[in-house]
């Protein structure tokens, strides 16, 4: 309490060894304790000081949400610098304009951004930084509560960035208020430990920072960050990681509602809503009726913390009826960020809660919410006129319209500047009309703006801009909505948006109404309402553009994928890209079966039109072979007969083991493939600490009778299953398909292994080859290395083809050699290029091995 700056809060809360940050890139997972975060932050602070960064100088963070963002944020504050966070979705041009205003000394970039413009600052890549290094005896500058901690830039009404000044005192006022509250409720949280928050708001957003950087340390919670966007994949992450709450914008709740609705179509609809849903009798009833949804999200999941945009009351009621908490908050960047928050133990439906401790608010005569308090920013960076306009009479003019009830609960009506004033002088709130439109069948998204009627440029009328399902008529939608609206709210004109989705802000998902209104006004020649063509084939365009980007050639629907040079890995990468952009799961088998561009377009369009976010069935992979009993059986068999037999038959010479001292597991061992003896000999050559944590890949199609038993006799099925389970048990092996179907699931399973600390052993040739005719390495090794972000250790095996050639059943003794090369950290994103690099590394080991033999 009474801290001088945020650095003191950091020292108070970032010493435990408990888990703090988890990062899931869609395939593998990383985790960092509070103390590891503190050490990484100190390393970054030392690096900034070595670069000459002084107190008050700016560090621009332009990155996706990832642990390194948190390291850099706290490291910047430890160095006395001012953080300038910019969302990963921002354009390079916007970042360049921000840099012109803020003049940062250092620019730290994430993996998903590309800075095209020149900046007069040192540029760092967060994911490539070494977060272990000298940080001892680091002294932070004497920063006070009045010093700037952040400058948060948003796009102003003129399109030019405006920087909101956030001081250490602004942030501490909110932290210390929560800290006092936590003292009272900590005992109630103990049954839910360990608390895990899924952070779906970007860290460049102030509400996202409040959850990850303030609330989580105060509750000793873990923060899970992810690159996943598909609702089904997110639900799987919530269930498997034991997430208690999701921090998000309302659009995420809407996406999850579509997923949950699939589970309750055949179930009685849960009854009750709002506070009554949390009465004991209603709660038990709702939990039972929503049991299928509970299995989808996991039984530890309690609900959502929502901010950044207005929440539809019906959406809130939907989740409350199912027994989930929906805690809604309200705030602005200028208020650091929280103005009000619903008490999770006493939520008020439809309200954004009561005022945060220390915050004062009043409603102006025109309905605008005015705020003041220690959390309110002192103004805009280098813009005194804009500061004066927003902070008149000591009150921050929020631009939002609302009301306060007798108990102090705040309700939001809409945005003042977005309100439509009809010719009759009636105020129309766009959100009210959008709520009705969104309830009309076939409406995927809607935006309501004020526009004059054709031929009359003086008065605004209500116009709707729609994103419709294929075949839905805009005129019919308007007529149906008008039947539900009050007479003064009725829509006078409607337009069909010609693109995939309505434009929204990247961080909070708010509609960009000004952009929508300006574009419709500029393209007024487009037919309004009836007869306006529905959305064009934007999904098909997306496929065409992606193919042309990868091949550099034009493509028609009849173009052959093979003739275009699209490999199986290209198709897998396109599948992952389309899933991320559409938010829908797609059948990998359809992608694998596609032969033309038209086939691919049809597969993508079927997934998008279905609107179903459900995940495809996961392939079968062994997890039982990693339990304690299986590991004991494996170690016993390997030690007693498997490895001694391999050493007896192969009499191996092992070279290059010293290269393993240069890397820590997990890694990918990539080897040439001459014989079925290769994997046992490599295991025999490895030191025990490596051998005990390795998972070799095996040829899935070899076990086709096990995986596709309907095509084989009972004898072949039984024999195949016995061999499969024996190899999976004794070798800890897992199946990899040779075709592209199933590659996505292989990536995810390999990610699970790597996340648990297991190294992988793969044979990128995909088949056994003679020593003098090694095959080309398939791009899968590059895809694994890129997506799992692990080093590759090249391995050359020689002589096994003489001991156990492919055509022989019984081996004969011989001499073999196993050579481990230096670890490779692959940075190119093209899997084919990466695979070629690994192939060349293995070939160089083979050449060195032959030269060594010649010298002997």
Model-found features: residue ranges?
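Conserved pre-ATP/AMP-binding loop-to-beta segment of ANL
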Residues: 19, 135-153, 160, 186-196
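Conserved AMP-binding/adenylate-forming core of the ANL superfamily
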Residues: 21-66, 70-74, 91-96, 100, ...
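Conserved AMP-binding A3 loop
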Residues: 31-34, 149-176
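Conserved ATP-dependent adenylate/AMP-binding module captured primarily in the ANL superfamily
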Residues: 73, 88-116, 131-135, 174-198, ...
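AMP-binding/adenylate-forming catalytic core of the ANL superfamily
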Residues: 107, 363, 373, 378-379, ...
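Conserved AMP-binding/adenylation subdomain of ANL enzymes
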Residues: 172-196, 203-291, 300
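Conserved C-terminal "lid"/linker of ANL adenylate-forming enzymes
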Residues: 447-450, 482-534
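Non-catalytic C-terminal accessory region of glycerolipid acyltransferases
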Residues: 474-475, 521, 740-856
């Amino acid at each position: 309490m009474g801290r001088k700056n945020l650095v003191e809060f950091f020292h108070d809360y970032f010493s435990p060894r408990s888990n703090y940050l988890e990062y899931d890139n869609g395939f593998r997972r990383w985790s960092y304790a509070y103390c590891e975060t503190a050490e990484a932050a100190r390393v970054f602070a030392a690096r900034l000081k070595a670069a000459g960064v002084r107190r008050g100088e700016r560090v621009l963070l332009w990155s996706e949400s990832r642990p390194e963002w948190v390291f850099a944020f706290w490291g910047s504050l430890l160095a006395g610098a001012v953080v300038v966070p910019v969302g990963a979705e921002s354009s390079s041009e916007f970042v360049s304009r921000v840099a012109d205003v803020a003049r940062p000394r250092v620019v730290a970039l994430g993996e998903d951004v590309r800075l095209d413009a020149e900046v007069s600052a040192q540029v760092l890549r967060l994911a490539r930084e070494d977060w272990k290094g000298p940080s001892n005896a680091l002294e932070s500058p004497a920063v006070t509560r009045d010093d700037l901690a952040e400058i948060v830039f948003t796009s102003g009404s003129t399109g030019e960035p405006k920087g909101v000044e956030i001081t250490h005192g602004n942030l501490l006022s909110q932290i210390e208020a929560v800290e006092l509250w936590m003292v009272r409720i900590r005992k109630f949280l103990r049954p839910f430990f360990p608390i895990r928050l899924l952070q779906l708001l970007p860290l460049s957003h102030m509400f996202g920072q409040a959850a990850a950087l303030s609330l989580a340390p105060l509750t000793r919670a873990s923060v899970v960050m992810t690159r996943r966007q598909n609702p089904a994949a997110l639900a799987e992450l919530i269930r498997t990681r034991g997430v208690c709450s999701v921090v998000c914008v309302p659009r995420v709740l809407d996406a999850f509602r579509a997923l949950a609705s699939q589970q309750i179509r055949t179930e009685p609809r849960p009854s009750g809503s709002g506070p009554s849903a949390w009465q004991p009798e209603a709660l038990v009833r709702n939990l039972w009726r929503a049991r299928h949804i509970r299995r989808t999200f996991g039984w530890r999941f309690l609900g959502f913390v929502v901010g950044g945009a207005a929440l539809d009351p019906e959406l809130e009621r939907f989740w409350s009826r199912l027994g989930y908490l929906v805690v809604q908050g309200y705030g602005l960047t200028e208020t650091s960020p929280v103005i009000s928050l619903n008490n999770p133990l006493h939520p008020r439906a439809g309200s954004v809660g009561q005022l945060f401790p220390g915050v004062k608010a009043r409603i102006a005569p025109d309905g605008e919410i005015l705020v003041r308090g220690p959390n309110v920013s002192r103004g805009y960076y280098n813009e005194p006129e804009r500061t004066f306009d927003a902070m008149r009479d000591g009150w921050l003019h929020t631009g939002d319209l609302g009301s306060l009830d007798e108990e102090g609960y705040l309700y939001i009506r809409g945005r003042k500047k977005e309100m439509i004033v009809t010719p009759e002088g009636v105020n129309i709130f766009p959100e009210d009309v959008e709520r009705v439109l969104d309830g009309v069948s076939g409406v995927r998204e809607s935006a309501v703006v004020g526009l004059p009627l054709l031929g009359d440029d003086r008065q605004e009328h209500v116009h709707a801009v729609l994103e419709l399902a294929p075949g839905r008529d805009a005129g019919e939608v308007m007529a149906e909505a008008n039947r539900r609206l009050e007479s003064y709210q009725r829509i006078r004109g409607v337009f069909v948006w010609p693109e995939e989705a309505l434009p929204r802000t990247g961080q909070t998902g708010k509609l960009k109404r000004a952009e929508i209104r300006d574009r419709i006004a500029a393209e007024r020649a487009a037919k309004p309402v009836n007869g306006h063509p529905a959305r064009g084939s934007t999904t098909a365009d997306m496929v065409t553009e992606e193919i042309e980007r990868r091949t550099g050639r034009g493509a028609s629907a009849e173009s052959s994928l093979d003739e275009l040079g699209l490999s199986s890995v290209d198709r897998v990468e396109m599948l992952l890209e389309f899933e991320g952009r559409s938010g829908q799961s797609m059948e990998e088998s359809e992608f694998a079966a596609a032969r033309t561009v038209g086939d691919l377009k049809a597969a993508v369009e079927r997934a998008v039109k279905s609107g179903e976010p459900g995940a495809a069935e996961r392939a079968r992979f062994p997890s039982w072979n990693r339990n304690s009993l299986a590991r004991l059986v494996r170690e016993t068999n390997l030690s007693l007969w498997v490895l001694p037999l391999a050493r007896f038959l192969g009499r191996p010479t092992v070279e290059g083991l010293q290269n393993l001292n240069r890397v820590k597991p997990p890694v990918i061992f990539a080897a040439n493939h001459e014989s079925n003896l290769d994997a046992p000999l490599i295991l025999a050559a490895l030191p025990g600490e490596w051998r005990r944590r390795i998972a070799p890949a095996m040829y899935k199609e070899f076990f086709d009778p096990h995986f596709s038993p309907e095509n084989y006799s009972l004898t072949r099925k039984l024999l195949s299953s016995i061999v499969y389970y024996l190899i999976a048990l004794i070798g800890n092996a897992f199946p990899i398909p040779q075709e592209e179907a199933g590659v996505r699931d292989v990536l995810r399973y390999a990610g699970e292994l790597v996340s648990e600390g297991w190294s992988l052993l793969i044979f990128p040739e995909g088949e056994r080859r003679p020593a003098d005719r090694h095959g080309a390495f398939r791009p899968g090794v590059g895809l694994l290395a890129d997506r799992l972000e692990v080093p590759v250790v090249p391995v050359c095996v020689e002589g096994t083809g003489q001991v156990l050639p492919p055509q022989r059943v019984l081996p004969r003794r011989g001499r073999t050699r196993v050579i481990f090369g230096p670890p490779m950290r692959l940075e190119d994103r093209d899997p084919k290029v990466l695979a070629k690099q690994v192939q060349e590394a293995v070939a160089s080991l083979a050449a060195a091995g032959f030269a060594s033999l010649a010298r002997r």
